[in-house]
Amino acid sequence: MTRKQTPMTLALCALGLFAASAASALAADAPMAPPKSEINAAVGTGAKFTPPPESAIPDDDFGKMVKLGRDIMLDTPKYAKDYVGNTLSCVNCHTDAGRMAGSAPLWAAYVSYPAYRGKNKKVNTFEERLQGCFKFSQNGKAPPLGSKTLVALESYSYWLSKGLPVDEKVAGRGYPNLPEPQQAPDYVRGQKVYEAKCILCHAANGEGQYVNGETVFPPLWGPKSFNWGAGMGSYKNAAKFIYANMPYGMSYSLSPQEAWDVAYFMDAQERPQDPRWQGSVAATRAKFHDSKFSLYGTKVNGKLLGDIGAPKPR
């Protein structure tokens, strides 16, 4: 039996960065995709592509792999448990089961690879890009190339992209651009936004909410969230995601300044160590976080962020 989440519940749970629906989190069988908002992340992206509906998944061996990829997207700790080190699921960053333009949709990502990535300074295949998601956003370990987990996710992404020309600049890819704010992002202002619009879902300390051990609303920081190496560890990336996708079901309801401020506040909290640890916070920041949009290795409220020792072995 699947528990339902009412529209009122969604309306109340404002600004849950990574807000996953209770329906997908608590499904007993195959997970269900959270509903799309009437005003969603696709607005303003210029995207004209519509991925095929789930009803069009073929009823054959390939279709079974596509469905497994979809299930991994919606409940990653359940369907890819060997490679996950936290309680997040892929759908928390890629809404509508990876279909939504402006929410880093899988169909746009699939046609954008292979591509050079500054993050690891080499050309990455699509499977290698997926490996990074498990290593950083899932705070786990990379599934081997050719593994069933990666083949399933790649199959699902390929199926979503059918009919879309290969183009690394396809409209709707990633998150919509958000210009830097007139005022520098601020911790105190961000805390006020969080307390007004996030706390009901994600709790006072960003720990999220759970029912019977299942994630209903995922953690935004702390030991069960993404690690310092994840893309959301850049408060610029986080601000873009928040502005276009949150509050869940209420996209673009925050001002750009509010999105920047609350992203800064979220990324000013402690989380698991960057797995690329270089032996010290200073060395790790110098090699991987030398950006004004990363708070890793900086002091916030007297605390040196990232000063938690070496990462735990996976």
Curated annotation (Swiss-Prot):
Catalytic activity: 2 thiosulfate + 2 Fe(III)-[cytochrome c] = tetrathionate + 2 Fe(II)-[cytochrome c] + 2 H(+)
Residues reported in the UniProt entry to bind heme c 2: 198, 201-202
Changes after translation: Binds 2 heme c groups covalently per subunit.
GO cellular component: periplasmic space
Keyword Signal included in the entry's annotation: yes
Alphabetic keyword roster: Heme, Iron, Metal-binding, Oxidoreductase, Periplasm, Repeat, Signal
GO molecular function: electron transfer activity; heme binding; metal ion binding; thiosulfate dehydrogenase activity
Alphabetized Pfam families for the sequence: Cytochrom_C, SoxA-TsdA_cyt-c
Domain Cytochrome c: 58-192, 185-270
Record-given protein name: Thiosulfate dehydrogenase
